[in-house]
């Protein structure tokens, strides 16, 4: 297994790998290389090139606009050099995210209080249909949270999901909270749902909540 560092500001160096040894040992046991980069255009090309049965969603418009490399990152898992899983995250406040979401996806929105301090939004989770059921996506999500908290120094990581995936986000991705965010009549929210999906939730964890879950989440890596 190798760490591939193609990011201008954030890297997976030896000290960082040792800090999260159990997590990286899992990737090594699966013969996976882990890449961090800041090429969001390539990420879009990877996801939009997939057939509907491999990636069912439109690309998340949050990652369409210009992104400063210092405020976000892309993660890939590679198997025999093929990209087999993705994730992305960027610094963004909840009010800004919701304001932008309302412009693209009109609907009935709940009021959710802003998070204290800097927050990070994450999306674009995908695992190749040929490699699902191996815990790769779940463990990559955990690495993404660690990077948001450790390297980007965020206090909260949040994501949105369709209502059917609430259990997955809370009990498998180990977010500490999930609240209903909006009813979107047209559905089809990029990175989160298809046309049939009308109800969307926000899942989130603070850095303290994530630290308190470490004993629990590390059992996934064995």
Regions found by a protein language model. Give the residues of each.
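Terminal substrate-recognition subdomain of acyl/acetyltransferases
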Residues: 1-59, 114-118, 125-130, 149-222
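Short secondary-structure capping micro-motifs at structural edges
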Residues: 61-64, 73, 106-114, 143-146
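A short helix-loop-beta-strand connector motif used in the catalytic cores of GNAT acetyltransferases and
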Residues: 64-75, 94-99
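Conserved beta-hairpin
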Residues: 71-86
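GNAT/GCN5-related N-acetyltransferase fold signature
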Residues: 77, 89-91, 127
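Amphipathic alpha-helical scaffolding segments
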Residues: 88-94, 140-145, 163-164
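Conserved acyl-donor/pantetheine-binding loop and adjacent beta-alpha core of acyl/acetyltransferases
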Residues: 88-121
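Conserved acetyl-CoA-binding loop-helix of GNAT-fold acetyltransferases
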Residues: 132-148
């Amino acid at each position: 297994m190798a760490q591939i560092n193609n990011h201008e500001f954030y890297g997976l160096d030896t000290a960082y790998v040792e800090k999260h040894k159990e997590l990286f040992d899992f990737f090594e046991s699966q013969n996976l290389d882990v890449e961090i980069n800041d090429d969001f255009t390539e990420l879009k090309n990877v996801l939009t090139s997939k057939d509907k049965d491999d990636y069912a969603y439109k690309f998340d418009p949050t990652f369409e606009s210009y992104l400063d490399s210092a405020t976000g990152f892309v993660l890939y898992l590679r198997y025999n050099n093929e990209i087999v899983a993705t994730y992305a995250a960027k610094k963004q406040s909840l009010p800004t995210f919701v304001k932008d979401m309302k412009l693209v996806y009109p609907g009935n929105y709940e009021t959710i209080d802003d998070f204290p301090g800097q927050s990070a939004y994450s999306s674009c989770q995908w695992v190749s249909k040929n490699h699902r059921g191996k815990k790769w996506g779940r463990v990559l999500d955990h690495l993404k949270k660690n990077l948001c908290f450790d390297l980007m120094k965020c206090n909260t990581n949040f994501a949105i999901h369709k209502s059917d995936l609430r259990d997955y986000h809370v009990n498998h991705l180990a977010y500490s909270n999930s609240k209903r965010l909006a009813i979107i009549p047209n559905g089809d929210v990029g990175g989160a749902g298809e046309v049939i999906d009308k109800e969307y939730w926000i899942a989130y964890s603070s850095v303290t909540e994530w630290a308190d879950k470490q004993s629990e989440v590390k059992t996934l890596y064995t």
